[in-house]
Amino acid sequence: MIILIPAYKPDQSLVRLARALRKQDPAAEILVIDDGSGSAYAPIFTELRIDGVTVQTHPANKGKGAALRTGIAWAKANRPGEVIVTADADGQHLPRDIFRVGVRTETAAVAGQRSIILGVRTKPDPNAGEEGTKVPLRSKIGNSATVGFFALATGARVADTQTGLRGFTPQILDWLLQIPGDKYEYEFSMLLRATRADVELVQVPIVKVYEPGNPTSHFRPLQDSALIYAPLLAFLASSFLTGFLVDAIALFVLVGMGAPLLVAVVGARIISALTNFTVNRMLMHDGGA
């Protein structure tokens, strides 16, 4: 099992997380991607290396998506056949939940499944106070919106589309490396594409842990939300345009060819549905999301 943690300007929470993971399973490979944090944060990464953590470094900040792809490529080249579990650097994922997702991912890998195992934040932390379990308003609104729009666009219900705790079976690593997006949109794009790429989405309940004020988060609400929603809007727009325009054009052509109205309506709907499926499939595989 490889535990992949992208990190940008982390604090000691990352060191504590790595030590807790090492204590729980000394055999697990912990891989941290320093996403251009800069010299001021070098002592933290040095401390991680001393503790036996593998650290790969981007010379400049590229974004979470790029850091995840760097880690996936490293794992594929250096530890082929192993599952990958991603976690956030701010300590919002408990070690026991990280390993729960990892074990479930290993089970799927042994079965030869193409799977993404999602740690969905639905369980309160019994060891945290009121502030430690209270979901920030922007996170609550953002996740509720993406859950709803994701279901509308794909027909799939995922309780936590923004979770950073995910398990990947080795069967999908090549596919993951082909998904575009260097920042936060990468994680959402993989979920959209999974619904069209025969990749199973499995949900595992985990404890929700939030730091008051989330001081170590580098998420920019406006810019990064726009990036996340761009692939979703492209997906929905393609569905509307192909559905409405193709439907109307096909109906006009079929009626013009002399088909009875009922036959023309049914034929137009079939043509529209096939076109919609084809366009969405191209969108998901050729860089539209």
Regions found by a protein language model. Give the residues of each.
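Conserved donor nucleotide-binding strand/loop of the catalytic core
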Residues: 46-81
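Conserved short acidic donor-positioning loop in nucleotide-sugar-dependent glycosyltransferases
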Residues: 9, 35-39, 62, 71
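Cell-envelope/extracellular polymer assembly enzymes that use nucleotide-activated donors
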Residues: 1-2, 29, 189
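Short, well-formed alpha-helical segments that are part of the catalytic scaffolds
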Residues: 9-23
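Hydrophobic helical membrane-anchoring modules
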Residues: 11, 179-256, 269-289
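Acceptor/aglycone-binding surface of glycosyltransferases and processive sugar-polymer synthases
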Residues: 59-60, 66-74, 95-184, 211-219, ...
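A conserved acidic beta->alpha catalytic loop
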Residues: 34-43, 91
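Short beta-strand-to-loop acidic/aromatic patch adjacent to the donor-nucleotide binding site
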Residues: 81-92
